Amino acid sequence: MFFKQLAVLSFATSALAAHGVRNPGTNSLNFNRIDKRFTFPIPESQGSQTFEATYTISGNETFDGGMKTYGRGVDCSGQAEGGDSDAVFIVKDGGTLKNAIIGADQIEGVHCEGSCTIENVWWEAVCEDALSLKTGDGPFTVIGGGAQNADDKVIQHNGGGTVSISGFTAYNFGKLYRSCGNCDEMYERHVTLESVTAVSGSASLVGINSNYGDTATIKSDTCVTDVDTVCTEYEGTDNNDEEPQEISTGPSNACQYTDPLPSC
């Protein structure tokens, strides 16, 4: 009888593991973890174009990239800070970039100088940052698209105002969104995440500076798998020579979400 019960238990455990179900009392999946089989859903490229200089999208202009891959023909320089001249695109106040793939052959990705819309834009591989919201008080809108293989940040918010991120996919990243923690000029910033898919995040989905009044609102239709922390609060500083200090993690008045978020 004992051996029959043991055999049944062994079969049940194997069945759960085969379907990637968590073992009771553990925090890991048996055998088939989602991040091991996750496929980053980047669209098929419709061609490629290499810019010799940064391409500027003027205010109120919409640049439709036709799902081509755009780059600068250079090697990534890691986390060394680049400048506007290293970006693939600069989007001026009121401009829109849509339907584009940012190739791995670049340093700075996309810069927004003022309010911008980034729609269905994908990053093959993030270098320093994927998207830098450099100036202005927004609103900044990210619709769809995605980024993968970011050692640190995907979206860096240096200006003020509000960022809306919806339907975005982040895979193998450090932080999806970071409100600048030590810019020379600090602002109150707000971010909302809706229908975001985040898999394999080594640091935090969102990082904000609550001492400057920042807030993060993460809707319950956002899913996370193997993301170290959902929301981290920092004490930001306007001294660029200092690093911001972590205050807390988890839901709060500044980090607004229901814990736990669903798995992807």
UniProtKB/Swiss-Prot annotation:
The keyword 4Fe-4S does not apply. Its EC number is 4.2.2.2. The keyword Lyase applies. InterPro entries: Pectate_lyase_PlyH/PlyE-like (IPR004898), Pectin_lyas_fold (IPR012334), Pectin_lyase_fold/virulence (IPR011050). It comes from the Eukaryota. Residues 235-245 have a biased composition (Acidic residues). PANTHER family: PECTATE LYASE F-RELATED, PECTATE LYASE H-RELATED. This is Probable pectate lyase D. The lineage of its organism: Eukaryota, Fungi, Dikarya, Ascomycota, Pezizomycotina. The gene is plyD.
